[in-house]
Amino acid sequence: MTPPAVPSVWKLTKLTLLAEGIGGSVWRAVDSDGRTSVVKRLSPQAAPDAPQALAWLRWRDGAGAIRLLDAEGDWQWLEDAGRRTLTSVLDVEGDAAATRIAADVLGALHAPSDRPAEGLQTMEDRFAALRLEADNQGGLFSEAAGLTASLMSEGVSIRPLHGDLHHDNILHGPRGWLAIDPHGVLGDPAYDAANLLYNPVERQDLRTDPERAQRLARTLAPAVGRPAQAILAWGFCHACLSAAWHLEDENREEAARSLEVAQAIRRTLEV
């Protein structure tokens, strides 16, 4: 792919494509001081969600997360967070080692910030697709929608969340392990750990293991200051939400895989 014309004020050269997909393209570049950084060009499909992600990045200001250097139109200029993913740790050192690192990153992300966090997605908006499938299909979707409503009514102190933390969104570089690609959500801290139960998406053997879900929840709970059972409950709801999103995209195969994850986590909630 021919390198695109990034905003000239950034004075970036030597663009190298890192990834391209439905969300847009990501490039590594060299700035005027010879340092590497990353630029992301959002696709039209991803652009509507950009304000929440940018708001969250500005709120963290590099604490536990990639630092936003600038943004212009559909372009984002970001710190180079490194090349090693948490998935590589899982593959080489195992799930327990990867989960310990994820817990450390979560702890850093949930540390207080003096900056305001505005314009984040609400949990009500985030779970709209789940409520729609609950009305259309019932079953697990209805159960998850009911549990989601119950969790959101518990009066838990909400805070800004990454919203999409998983093994390929945690990178290691000069500043250690950092989170990238946030969604920017305002909600129960336990929800920020829930997506790790759903990942890696390629490892259905791990995702559908109830005992693994319980181990992860116990390890991640101290990082977000919530009980392991709350993480498991949100994990079930999130897996059903993911299935609903896949159905919106008419991807029934991935929806079925997501529901397998939901059913596995659901078993940990049964008395």
Q: Positions of the model-derived regions?
A:
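Regulatory N- and C-terminal appendages and interdomain linkers associated
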Residues: 1-13, 139-142, 150, 208-212, ...
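A cross-family kinase active-site recognition segment
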Residues: 82, 88-142, 184-188, 271
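Conserved NTP-binding catalytic cores of kinases and kinase-like/nucleotidyltransferase enzymes
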Residues: 1-65, 176, 264-271
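An alpha-helical support segment within catalytic cores of ATP-dependent transferases
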Residues: 2-6, 114-163, 173, 222
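A conserved alpha-helical element in kinase catalytic cores
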Residues: 22-23, 35-77, 84-109, 209
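Active-site acidic catalytic loop and adjacent metal/ATP-binding pocket
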Residues: 25-30, 39, 68, 146-191
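Active-site Asp-x-Gly
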Residues: 173-218, 222-228, 252, 258-261, ...
